[in-house]
């Protein structure tokens, strides 16, 4: 079995400032500390040892899902801290501007700073335009970096085969070119229009363009011979 736990401490502050704009500048800032742990536990010995039906082509374990072997169990953990600041204000009666910055430092992936800028313009009494540009960062979870499991399935010729999901740092993965996972990063652009009519009709239309790099997923099947 697998368990993943997380403990988080957040400290947040918000305050409006009168800086001579149409409305006060609202500022939010804060700090976050997060600790994550991932632990895998070995199954019953009979669930992963070779059984008496191995000579008939059956894999180890029962129901096609072998238990986790004792040499595969373990515990990993990491922590990260984050600092952020977010500001928003109506520059004029009809134009709102917002911006945000977030800094994070991971014990296993280093640090990064990402941001966002957004606006809303009330062009007419019942029509407004809005848009935003932001950058994103997502570190692999401890489960994604360390999960292991094996299932038994039928191959293309009807034979029984074992299919394994292995972490990229496993010797078998490295033999086939596996490397340590890297964080996902993204850039996002949005633009939209909002129309609110007196007869109760409310219309929104938004365009989204999200570019994601280093997306994390399982590899296609790799045969071992």
Give residue ranges: language-model regions:
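Outer-membrane beta-barrel channels and translocator barrels
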Residues: 18-22, 92-94, 122-126, 186, ...
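Outer-membrane beta-barrel transmembrane domain signature of Gram-negative proteins
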Residues: 1-96
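Transmembrane beta-strands of outer-membrane beta-barrel proteins
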Residues: 25-29, 97-99, 115, 129-131, ...
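Residues that define the transmembrane beta-barrel architecture of outer-membrane proteins
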Residues: 3-9, 77-81, 111-113, 175, ...
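Residues on the lipid-exposed face of transmembrane beta-strands in outer-membrane beta-barrel proteins
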Residues: 11-15, 83-89, 117-121, 131, ...
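Flexible, surface-exposed loop regions and adjacent strand-edge segments
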Residues: 1, 43-53, 115-118, 146-154, ...
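Outer-membrane beta-barrel signature, preferentially recognizing the C-terminal barrel domain
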Residues: 72-78, 126, 137-204
